[in-house]
Curated annotation (Swiss-Prot):
Superkingdom in the source lineage: Bacteria
Subcellular location: Cell inner membrane
Role description: Could be involved in insertion of integral membrane proteins into the membrane.
Topological category with respect to the lipid bilayer: Peripheral membrane protein
UniProt key word Phosphoprotein: no
The protein's name: Putative membrane protein insertion efficiency factor
NCBIfam families xref list: membrane protein insertion efficiency factor YidD
GO cellular component, one term: plasma membrane
Main location: membrane
N-terminal signal peptide: none
Pfam families cross-referenced by the UniProt entry: YidD
Length: 108
């Protein structure tokens, strides 16, 4: 089965191309192209943890999106969560930049 032209496994919606977001998404993409192949497809979520981190950084910036991606990876594993877990489109005001621990139990 062939994939459509221009297909990307990562989120392709509009996002501001700030230096932090570009750098963060570049690191995630580098991981996807290199280490992900050696580790194998073992993510228990949809979208996968790296796709989630890419979208979170693209939508919410390097600081909030990076924390969201880190917490998602920490949830993924034996005894962790599983299933469909999309990135929220908008972060609520209680998710302030100076309180990243509030992103731990983030629900869309």
């Amino acid at each position: 089965m062939a994939l459509p032209a221009g297909y990307s496994r990562n989120w392709s919606g509009p996002w501001p191309k700030t230096p932090g977001r570009v750098l963060g998404t570049a690191f995630v993409r580098l991981y996807q192209l290199t280490l992900s192949g050696f580790i194998g497809n073992s993510c228990r979520h949809f979208p996968t943890c790296s796709e989630y981190a890419y979208e979170a950084i693209a939508r919410h910036g390097l600081w909030a999106g990076g924390w969201m991606g880190l917490f998602r990876v920490m949830h993924c594993g034996p005894g962790g969560t599983h299933g469909i877990d999309p990135v929220p489109e908008i972060l609520q005001p209680r998710h302030a930049w100076w309180a990243p621990w509030r992103l731990w139990k983030l629900k869309p």
